[in-house]
Structures are given as C-alpha cells and as structure tokens.
From Swiss-Prot:
Key word Translocase present: no
Keyword Protein transport part of the UniProt annotation: no
Protein name as catalogued: UDP-glucose 6-dehydrogenase
Residues annotated as transmembrane: none
UniProt GO molecular function: NAD binding; UDP-glucose 6-dehydrogenase activity
Gene3D superfamilies: N-(1-d-carboxylethyl)-l-norvaline Dehydrogenase, domain 2 (1.10.1040.10), NAD(P)-binding Rossmann-like Domain (3.40.50.720)
EC top class named in words: oxidoreductase
Residues annotated as binding substrate: E141, F142, L143, R144, E145, K204, N208, Y249, N250, N251, P252, S253, G257, K320
Annotated binding of NAD(+), by residue: 2-19, 29, 34, 83, 118, 145, 259, 263, 327
Organism taxonomic ancestry: Bacteria, Bacillati, Bacillota, Bacilli, Lactobacillales
Enzyme Commission code(s) on record: 1.1.1.22
Catalytic activity: UDP-alpha-D-glucose + 2 NAD(+) + H2O = UDP-alpha-D-glucuronate + 2 NADH + 3 H(+)
Chain's gene name: hasB
Pfam families cross-referenced by the UniProt entry: UDPG_MGDP_dh (PF00984), UDPG_MGDP_dh_C (PF03720), UDPG_MGDP_dh_N (PF03721)
Membership in a protein family: Belongs to the UDP-glucose/GDP-mannose dehydrogenase family.
Length: 402
C-alpha cells in the first residue's frame, strides 16, 4: 500500500518508519535538511528505536519536498503536522493541518486522510463540513518524545475514528489503518477501538490532561512536603504502593512541560467553554503555581549564601532525560521568573551553540567551568555528571527518572 505522511516530527517519522516495514511510505516535509537526513538513513530527531530502524532494517521509506507528487499517488495520507497552542485566541493553531487537507483533496480524489495531529474536539466534523467529504478521519497518538517508535511497537491501544453514516470505503480504510498499526506492533492483543471522531478527539485531550493532573498532584504533594520539612520520597512511596495509584508517573518535577501536556490541557479547558468545571482549570493553574514556588525556593537558597556575587547555574533546558526538545520546558519559565528578579543566570546546554539574542542569560558549555561559576545548580532532572558538586544542586528529582 502507498502511504504518504505529512510531517517528520516524532509522530510522523515514527509512523513512517513503522509502516514502511510492510508498505511504501513517503514522508513529506518542508525542510531540506530533514528530507536529506531521512533519505540517508539518519534520524532528524533523537529516538533510539528510529535511529536503529533507519540504520538496520529494510524499509520502503523515502522523504520528499514534493508534496503534491507524494499525495497524488497515496492510498492513505497521514497528517502529523504541528498544532501549537495559540495563546492569543486560546485555541490550537490548526492552519498547517488544514493546509495539508486542502492540498491533498486538490490532487487526490480517493485517498482517506488520517489526522494524527492533536486537534480540538469537533475539528473533524468541522473539516468534513468545510471540505464536503467524509474522507477525513482521526487517530489519536499516545507517544512519548524520544520513545515514539517504541510506543508504536508496543501500543497501549489503537483508536481510529469512523461514523455510522460514513461511506463503505471510509469505513474500510478506518479498519484497514487500525489493522496496519496492529500488525506492525510487536505487542500482542492490542485493544482496537473504532469510535466517533469527537469521542476520539476527547480521548486524546482527556488522557493527556489526566497525565498532567497526576504530575500536578505529586508536585503539590512535594511542595507541601518540602515546605513542612517532610520526607517527600517516603510520602510518595507510601501512597504509590497502593495498586489503585501505582508507582509510576509520580516523580516530582519543576512542572509538566514538553510539546503535549501544556497545550492539550489549555485546549481542553477552552473546549469546556460554558460547561461547568473546576478541576481542568485547576490543573493549568497548579502548574503555574509550582513553577513560581520552585523559583522562590531557588531564591531562598541563594539568599542564604554569603557570596557577594550570586549566580544560578541551570543544568540543561530539556524537558526530560534523553530528550532533544526544549519546547514548553518548565525550567524556561523558572528562568524567566529568576531573571525578573535581576538574578544572574548561566546555562549548561550542550545541544545549543548560542542563546536567543534577547536572552540575557549566559551559555557556558564547558561543564567544569559551569560548575565553578555557579553558586547553585538548578536541574529538573538529576544527572550523575553533577555528583562531584551535589552540595550545590537544587532539584526535586526524587526517583532519578522522568
């Protein structure tokens, strides 16, 4: 089967690699550097499984800048373009998705379009009405950055949208796509759910908002424990051994961040509109409160020091361990709060060669020099590289994992 994938981020690329084991897949991107890397068997993103598969597996995979040619020949088109949250309108920016839909429909009269990008509830219905076609369906992704291909190989569930009054072809394509994902997975007995588009859209936003809720819960627990001088580690362990709660997703941090949770929680809150709620809004608020609290704690530690020159060293801007993504990283908001107090910031981030021109922080990518200059070293996730200056480190990473 010929499949086109719009977008080579962690969603699009992981799907492209997965499906190219048994299908002809063409990935479309607008960046020549990404296209060149993929065509040379190199991953443009950090993902151990993607890197290995591109290097070692026989894949029927190519990348191109020629979108029209790729879409024209495809039987299925997967759309995995960004939908960033637009704070000005308090809604997802879906223009990239809509642009691809329009382009595909202009050159292909038979392919079913499968949207993998995260979208607002009701978006598929809106697009079907706008473009007068039922050939647009939704399949939410549940992938972690840096582990996207692994999560496709071992999925928790597969969800594809389909409506009762859809044409036989669209119904067949929805089932076919679900089967493609299931047959490519290494995990057995993966649950497959076919449901309405609005329900599938809701699953995605509510699932990520629950994860954000869990992060916020353990962060607020940790705030209480630190403020009352309780052993946060012991409290969390005592709670998490309850099977109903579980020993997962319970490690305190500076706040949830990354590409999905911040924007998905805000979008769900926007979708509520006039529907009564308090919890969803509280999750978003809790994350902001946590970052402010962390900044205050750093300032308190700094003020206790007698050194005339006080420098905060930020170890890594990445959101998670082994990530290459700085987007919506909680530490960046903490840095902004500290800078508003005229505190000198130095940053160790080996993935950067320079900071943005308006950034008043200083990039120090010699680790030993960084350690010497900093009075306090702040890190969202602890690393053994800091073991020799452990007495300088402020972190709320209790379990040494994400």
């Amino acid at each position: 089967m010929k499949i086109a994938v719009a977008g080579s981020g962690y969603v699009g690329l992981s799907l492209g690699v997965l499906l190219s084991l048994q299908n002809e897949v063409t990935i479309v991107d607008i960046l020549p550097s990404k296209v060149d890397k993929i065509n040379n068997g190199l991953s443009p993103i950090q993902d151990e499984y993607i890197e290995y598969y591109l290097k070692s597996k026989q894949l029927s995979l190519q990348a191109t800048l020629d979108s029209k040619a790729a879409y024209k020949e495809a039987e299925l088109v997967i759309i995995a373009t960004p939908t960033n949250y637009n704070s000005r309108i308090n809604y997802f920016d879906t223009q990239h998705v809509e642009t691809v839909i329009k382009e595909v429909l202009s050159v292909n009269s038979h392919a079913t379009l499968i949207i993998k990008s995260t979208i607002p509830i009701g978006f598929i219905t809106e697009m079907r009405q706008k473009f007068q076609t039922d050939r647009i369906i939704f399949s939410p992704e549940f992938l972690r950055e840096s582990k996207a291909l692994y999560d496709n190989l071992y999925p928790s569930r597969i969800i594809v949208s389909c409506e009762e009054n859809d044409s036989p072809k669209v119904k067949a394509d929805a089932e076919k796509f679900a089967l493609l994902l299931k047959s490519a997975a290494k995990k057995n007995n993966v649950p497959v759910l076919i449901m309405g588009a609005s329900e599938a859209e809701a699953v995605k936003l509510f699932a990520n908002t629950y994860l954000a809720l869990r992060v916020a819960y353990f962060n607020e627990l940790d705030t209480y424990a630190e403020s009352r001088k309780l052993n946060s580690h012991m409290v969390i362990q005592g709670i998490s051994y309850d099977d109903r709660i579980g020993m997962h997703y319970n490690n305190p941090s500076f706040g949830y961040g990354g590409y999905c949770l911040p924007k998905d929680t805000k979008q769900l809150l926007a979708n509520y509109n006039n529907i009564p709620q308090t919890l969803i809004e509280a999750i978003v608020s809790s994350n902001n409160v946590r970052k402010s609290y962390i900044a205050k704690q750093i300032i308190n530690v700094l003020e206790e020091q007698e050194s005339p020159v006080k420098v905060v060293g930020v170890y890594r801007l990445i959101m998670k361990s082994n990530s290459d993504n700085f987007r919506e990283s909680a530490i960046k908001d903490v840095i902004d709060i500290l800078k508003s107090k005229d505190i000198k910031i130095i940053i160790y981030e080996p993935m950067l060669n320079k900071l943005e021109s308006e950034d008043q922080s200083v990039l120090v990518n010699d680790l030993e020099n960084f350690k010497k200059q900093a009075n306090i070293i702040v890190t969202n996730r602890y690393d053994n590289e800091l073991q020799d200056v452990k007495n300088k480190v402020y972190s709320r990473d209790i379990f040494g994992r994400d």
